[in-house]
Each structure stands twice: as C-alpha cells, then as structure tokens.
Amino acid sequence: MTEEGVEWLARRPRPAVSWKTQKQAALFGETPTQELLMPVEALRIRGRHNAMNALAALALIDAVGLPLGPALQVLKNYEGEAHRVQPVLSVNDIEFIDDSKGTNVGAVKAALEGLGKSGRRVSIILGGDGKGQDFSPLAQALADYADYAVLIGRDADKIEAGIAASGICLEKAGTDFEAAVQMAFDHAAKGGVVLLSPACASWDMFANYAERSARFVAKAKEIAASVSGKPEEVD
C-alpha cells in the first residue's frame, strides 16, 4: 500500500472484535485498517514482483503464528540471487541493476514489469545470442516501462525487428559492451534504472553470464567515479 507517497509492505490485522464478520463491519461503515510493516524501498531486492514475493513469505509466517519481526529483519538484509535484478550502485539518482541471468523474454518482461510498476523508468541493455526466440512479446512491456534500449551482439537486428512496435528509442552498440552501458546511462531518466537484462545468452561476446555481469559492474563503477568521484551506496 502507499501512504503519504511511500510504498509499504503492509498487512491487515486480525479483527479485535471476533464476532464482527466482514459483512457486519461493512454495515457499520467500517473499513479494514492496514498495519505498516516496512517501506518497500528498504528492501535490497528491487521490483514490485519481489515486493509481492516478500509479502507472500510474510503471509505464510503470519499464518502459522510466528512473529514477523525476525522475518522483516531477514528481508531487509536479503540481497537476492546474484545477477537476478541485483542492485549494483547508484549515481546521480540513477541505479544500475544487474539481471545478467535474464536470458529469455519471460525473465526480461518480469524485470521490466517489476521495476516499472514501482514507478521507475528503465534504460535497458538487450542482446546477444537470442537462441531462436521471438522477441515481439517484449514490445508492450518496453512501451509501458522503458524509455530507451541499446542493442548488442549477434541478434541485435532480430531484436530490433521484434520490439520496433514499442515505439521507444532503439540504438545499437555492436559488440562494444562498455559503450552500450555508457549509452544506457546517458539516456536514463532521473530516478530510473540502467538495467542489464539481455534476454539472450552471452556466448557470442562473453565466456558466460558472469563475465557479462562483471564487465557491467566495472563500467558502472567507472561511470560513477567519473561523474561523482565515488558511487552512492545502495541500501
């Protein structure tokens, strides 16, 4: 829920008066209150989909009668799986996010929707070995949540054709990955993200997805140092 412009993980407390059913409460003009648990921004994992996953975990814990305090502390410190919508650093109110394991269209759609539904505009790096995929299902998610895409690697032309209907700005960087990261940053909106979520395998340009991630992180740090002297900490 949102309160005073802040998104929260929240729950509906069990009713204090047990005899009142929901229908009876409605007759009295009452509306259920929400108990605020933790600001969504306090989570290290990014995206509305991850916030929903956190709520599902809390609901299970609450259902068996365990206290939520320890679970909330664990969630606050949980950094997520490496290379899966993983925050890297932030500079000038633009956050770099590593989703190098986003090697298929479905994973990239989930990342775009998860970040976009939390109100953040996306500047995305796409491309590599497309493994014969149809990229057209990405077009709507890009139209809804992204402003810019830079395309890299062997299947850049195929991706461009598949997502042209999105109407967003598309540019190509060939095999110059560092240039692609710079281009994505240069086009990113304040408060938005630079997202490496390529929808492709890495083999045409890298040894594996981990090398792709490492080069993304290295370039992000270089950009941060050149812009501000040092990267901002990601909470």
Regions found by a protein language model. Give the residues of each.
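Short, solvent-exposed loop/turn segments at secondary-structure boundaries
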Residues: 59, 206-209
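Phosphate-binding loop of NTP-binding sites
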Residues: 2, 186, 204, 217-235
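Short beta-strands and strand-loop turn motifs
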Residues: 121-123, 195-199
